[in-house]
């Protein structure tokens, strides 16, 4: 058997296996069986480490196979059998480095927000009407991505621009793991294209800012003094017509200490608008605190792919060349039309992989 003792990673893996066994014993104990809350917590804890345990078992199986093959080789006389054993040994030894890397990634500290829903804010930046059109394109892109994932979208607030553009929009994406997939989308997105209104065919550059915030699920995650809130109600706006709300159902909440303002007029009920606006406010306050903590960690590690800097130009969408380039990881993908239709998993997977590699590098220093 290959000696794994003294290697920090494998000591940690043995701890995880011991914890896994302990949790499974707890799960069938009378105390846990009689308490549904404890049972849920226990199952959740087991699910969080099951993949690590299974991957580690697979790793140890290959280690045992290698030892068995080497021992068999010592006593084997038949040349054909020796050749076959050599092939099996080579195959098993090639598996180990890949499994080790997978185990290292699985042992990285989990982002406690990864399973949460997200609130996404998109604002048109430099470029006037063209920036508003681009903001609308990004909203459609994330909406289509959510559809592909079978996630649900709820609008919180929206300000329309000219030509079917969006000055800004805030919306919730409801789905397990939404934050884990979308957290690297925060930043400045840039578009290069010829506007429909441009007679000379000159390429314009416009921007839109995206912020992805983990939604606050538990009100206890953020403490807010009611005295710090200014709540206004007003009549919902809109494009006019039969759906204009003639009552003061829209809600605007101002958090006086920070100056953060949120509003919601999407629902017909003032109570529902207030609930949505309050959740948006709590999420923004939670994100402020998270960003403060992140900036300390990420500045120490000098991570290239972060989740907090909204001023960072992260990506360019070039229409003439039909390409999208993420500047943080220097990755260019093509098929721009499909990308804007929500086919963005290739980019997201690359960002996650790059971030994991950076975390691994930082943890080994």
From Swiss-Prot:
Q: Any coiled-coil ranges, and where?
A: none
Q: Which family does it belong to?
A: Belongs to the prokaryotic/mitochondrial release factor family.
Q: Does the keyword Protein biosynthesis apply?
A: yes
Top-level taxon of the source organism? Bacteria
Q: Which UniProt keywords apply?
A: Cytoplasm, Methylation, Protein biosynthesis
- This chain belongs to the protein called Peptide chain release factor 1
Pfam families in the record = PCRF, RF-1
| Modifications the protein undergoes after translation, according to the UniProt entry | Methylated by PrmC. Methylation increases the termination efficiency of RF1.
Q: Does the keyword Transport apply?
A: no
What function is annotated for this protein? Peptide chain release factor 1 directs the termination of translation in response to the peptide chain termination codons UAG and UAA.
Q: Which parts of the sequence carry N5-methylglutamine?
A: 242
A molecular function GO annotation: translation release factor activity, codon specific
Localization recorded for this chain is: Cytoplasm
Taxonomic path: Bacteria, Fusobacteriati, Fusobacteriota, Fusobacteriia, Fusobacteriales
Q: Name one GO cellular component term.
A: cytoplasm
